[in-house]
Design a protein with these regions (language model features):
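Short, acidic loop-to-helix structural element flanking the phosphoryl-transfer center
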Residues: 71-99, 105-109, 137
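Conserved H-loop
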Residues: 30, 55, 117-122, 150
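Conserved Lys-Pro-Asp/Glu-containing loop-to-beta segment of HAD-superfamily phosphomonoesterases
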Residues: 134-164
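Active-site neighborhood of HAD-like aspartate-dependent phosphohydrolases
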Residues: 1-38, 55
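Acidic, Mg2+-coordinating phosphoryl-transfer loop and its flanking beta/alpha structural elements
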Residues: 156-196
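A short, structured active-site edge motif that brings together acidic residues
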Residues: 36, 118-133
Length: 210
């Protein structure tokens, strides 16, 4: 079973948004309109900045974000209620666990270790610092290669549409949790092939059978 990190295991929006705003202030760029959390928490941050038409300032914004997030933003974070107990019960049931996140892998490892969750995961896969691996489909490929031989069934648990699309590219179904940052990705909650919705941790437990 492969878990996303931001918006699935941890409530990380505060630190990500604060670091994002710091980066924009650093280069003198305006804050985009609309729901900032929905726009930036989940997708690769490099892609977010490069899509903002910042020109030559995009790379400087990325560097400023990484510096601020590495210094302070990563710790502005909290576990969602019930997550640790769920992981304990899944492991007790013999389920192999992994993390696949678009966050930089060293940062993901730091966060999971901070919360004492790293012990539960056989594999922690994230984006590479050199940018060669960042899209969800790439991060999932990195995770799956380390899990071989794969079990008969692999399941993704995430909160955003890119979790669903990345998993589907590998033939993996996704459980979309309702406490994350992807509500705008699934506006009508309409059934979709290979996708199950779990609004609460109790619903997720029922879906996973633990």
């Amino acid at each position: 079973m492969i878990f996303d990190l931001d918006g699935t295991l941890t409530d990380s929006a505060e630190g990500i948004v604060a670091s994002f705003l710091h980066a924009l202030e650093h280069i003198g760029a305006p804050v985009p309109p609309g729901d900032i959390v929905a726009q930036i928490v989940g997708p690769p941050m490099d892609d977010t900045f490069r899509a903002m038409e910042l020109g030559d300032d995009a790379e400087e914004a990325i560097a400023a974000f990484r510096a601020e997030y590495g210094a302070r933003g990563w710790a502005m974070n909290a576990l969602f209620d019930g997550i640790e107990a769920l992981l304990v019960d899944l492991r007790a049931a013999g389920v192999r666990l992994a993390v696949a996140t678009s966050k930089l892998e060293p940062t993901a490892r730091r966060i999971l270790a901070h919360f004492g969750l790293d012990q539960h995961f056989e594999v922690i896969a994230g984006a590479s610092p050199d940018g060669s691996r960042k899209a969800k489909v790439e991060v999932l490929a990195h995770a799956l290669s380390q899990l071989e031989p794969l079990p008969d069934r692999v399941l993704m648990v995430g909160d955003r549409s890119h979790d669903v699309h990345g998993a589907a590219a590998h033939g993996i179904d996704t459980v979309v949790v309702g406490w994350g940052y992807g509500k705008a990705d699934f506006p009508d909650g309409a059934p979709a092939s290979g996708v199950t919705h779990a609004a609460t941790i109790d619903e997720l437990r029922r879906t996973l059978g633990v």
